[in-house]
Amino acid sequence: MTSTLPNASTPDPASLQPSVRPGAHGRFGRFGGQYVPETLMPALAELEQAAAQAWNDPAFTAELNQLLKNYVGRATPLYEAERLTAHYRRADGGPRIWLKREDLNHTGAHKINNALGQALLALRMGKKRIIAETGAGQHGVATATVCARFGLECVIYMGAEDMRRQALNVFRMRLLGATVQPVTAGTATLKDATSEAIRDWVTNVESTHYILGSVAGPHPYPMLVRDFHAVIGQEARQQCREAFGRLPDVLMACVGGGSNAMGLFHPFVECTNVRLIGVEAAGDGVATGRHAATITEGRAGVLHGAMSLLLQDSDGQVQEAHSISAGLDYPGVGPEHSYLREIGRAEYGAVTDQQALGALRLVSELEGIIPALETAHAFAWLEQLCPTLPDGSEVVINCSGRGDKDVNTVAEKLGDQL
């Protein structure tokens, strides 16, 4: 494997109480904050206030829960991957593998949990125009979907390279009535799309709400996006108790910006006997410099309004990221992930493009589930994790999205092998 995981130390429980994460000024330890133009500060304050009021409004939570159930299709199942479990079984036993099936949500990924919640907040704030960034296209599709549902104008910023890789999702967004704005600056991927979305927001802040798609960006976004995705972990806690009578030993998820992982991890952070493992994209290999292993290789810096770990050169300039997965092709990561790594509560590793492709094929053939390339990175870590776990261990992987969108990319890479 590309990297090894450090031993997780037990953090001070007092530092992990939900009420203090984030703390003052949107900080997770030294990470987070609000590094934005002054013109955006009123909008961020308005959003934070609207979210606080909404969570305390029974009508809001009732509407959100009703839509999550009847529109999104929650709760998503916790599925026992019997053949994948058997594949990794040793002579002396091994772990049992479970999948939290976020791929079964409406639109095919976890992204709609957050898009739906933020759309409801936009309506409360009287905003009629929505913008968003997208990499793999799943957040763009989810945002376009909820905008269609509520009759909101929708503009999606997407890197031109990602539009090429994810042409199917581009068509889906346009079919849903969204304008997809190509971004050709820089590497024409997620970082550049995010930068363009922020520029739009600065210009149109009075009429526009920015539905940021990950647990990144300025406060309150890392907290807001996490809280809308926490339904993943909340359901998983209950489902684990029903399935095997206790909490799992390991939770695992892929990490780009980190929203699906944080949604799964958050309700378990205080349960220090549950290991939290995030898996990043090592691209062509960390040693090559062509990767997106931000936590594994990054240093603290500021990008898109927050301090977090970033891929940087010796001059402190943000480096280009690379991954076969458009959703992981980002040189930063959510500040709470950086914090959980720094205090030793969560562990992070990285797998290469080839390892992810191998895992995608393995899961497809063994379970009849074609995972997204992003999700396949988490599956690939099983190769390193399973030999280290005692018999009877329970492992839950967040199956964050389905792989329909990636079939063309996978066909280019594996077509002659099938």
Curated annotation (Swiss-Prot):
Keyword entries, A-Z: Amino-acid biosynthesis, Aromatic amino acid biosynthesis, Lyase, Pyridoxal phosphate, Tryptophan biosynthesis
UniProt GO molecular function: tryptophan synthase activity
SUPFAM superfamilies for this protein: Tryptophan synthase beta subunit-like PLP-dependent enzymes
Pathway as given in its UniProt record: Amino-acid biosynthesis; L-tryptophan biosynthesis; L-tryptophan from chorismate: step 5/5
UniProt EC number: 4.2.1.20
Class in the EC hierarchy, top level: lyase
Catalytic activity: (1S,2R)-1-C-(indol-3-yl)glycerol 3-phosphate + L-serine = D-glyceraldehyde 3-phosphate + L-tryptophan + H2O
Region Disordered: start-end pairs: 1-23
Bias type Polar residues, positions: 1-18
GO CC term, one of those recorded: cytoplasm
Cofactor dependence: pyridoxal 5'-phosphate
Residues the record lists as N6-(pyridoxal phosphate)lysine modifications: 111
Role of this protein: The beta subunit is responsible for the synthesis of L-tryptophan from indole and L-serine.
Subunit and partners: Tetramer of two alpha and two beta chains.
NCBIfam families, sorted: trpB
Family: Belongs to the TrpB family.
Name of the featured protein: Tryptophan synthase beta chain
Organism: Parasynechococcus marenigrum (strain WH8102)
Lineage: Bacteria, Bacillati, Cyanobacteriota, Cyanophyceae, Synechococcales
